[in-house]
Amino acid sequence: MKIFKQLSFLALLLSLTSCGGGGVDPKNPKSKEFELYIDYWNTQGTNPQITFDAVNSSPEVKIDFSQTFAGIAVPPNYTNVIIDNVRIIDANDVNYQIDGITAYEWREELDNWKEDVEFTMNYTQVQDLSVIMVLDESASLGEDFEKVKQYASSFITNVLAEIPNARIGIVDFADQIHSFPATNNKAALINYIASLTQGPFTTLYESVNLGIDMLEDMDAEAKVLLVFTDGTDNNSDPEFTPTYILDRLNNTTSDVKITSFTIGLEGKGGVDKPVLTEMAANGGSTAFPKNADELGKVFLKFSSSIANVYNLTYVRNQQVVPDSDKRKLRFVIKGTAKND
């Protein structure tokens, strides 16, 4: 009970003294600190596991907090727990690159947190990225459709500039659904987008389902679905419902979960906000720009957020830690805004 009171008190202090997820460095206003709280145990010395404390962790840290991550033993006397597909994104869709992580462990005898220099949290930016763009090309977009194609092309350019080996595929839809296979050939992708033409109706859910199929067939460390629409589905087969799509996103058949980002252009007033918000799953974000100019900014921010993804690795020894006496861990993540 004492630990949880301390944690609550610390969380209160942080909320009163910080902006957003953490403190701001006065010498670098783009730099902030974010916090991740973890429970750790290792019942046999070779089977480390962690769960997350979502209540005290900074909301900007985008992880699937419902997961329990299991690790492995590494000779001669180490264990590694990999936390994959981590992003730092604030409420304004500003993405942060990770500059460093400091580890702390709650020490009962000190009644305080103690910095840990032996057990560390390492981080690497993911370079093996697969993205499927699901793009609405319905007639309701009107003249804005040419801007959508421009923004989608810029998105491709930005992602490939950050990760040259990233593979990007396209699903485009109106009354018909078409697709372009994933590749890192920028010219081929942009030429395909330039060839898109508008049509009637909105086959949204079926198109998202195809995008999930494409991602599940791909091998990658990180998989992302980017969905853009300006309307609600009115042309998919009845089996393709929001519930069906959400179930597929949350129960993918591949080892890597799909992170989904959704954009609903509000100009025509027809987007289904609750559905698109739920569809932004597994650490993704959603945005509802009110016009084409705002839409361009969203595509730009999402290109940075999607490309800037990390795998974290918690390194510790093989000491037995019973699940009845889990270690309370705190990680302070220093990050710099990339796209504000």
Label each PLM-derived region with a short phrase.
Residues 15-18:
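C-terminal motif of bacterial Sec signal peptides marking the signal peptidase cleavage site
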Residues 20-28, 72-132, 139-146:
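Acidic, polar low-complexity linker/tail segments
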Residues 22-76:
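Acidic/polar, low-complexity intrinsically disordered N-terminal segments immediately downstream
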Residues 106, 120-134, 138-168, 181-188, ...:
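…and closely analogous acidic/polar surface helices at protein-protein or active-site interfaces
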Residues 135-137, 148, 170-173, 211, ...:
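DG-centered beta-turn motif at the end of beta-strands
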Residues 176-223, 233, 264-272:
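Von Willebrand factor
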Residues 231-282, 294, 300-301:
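VWA/integrin I-like adhesion module and closely mimicked acidic/polar interface patches used
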Residues 288-340:
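C-terminal "exit" segments of structured domains
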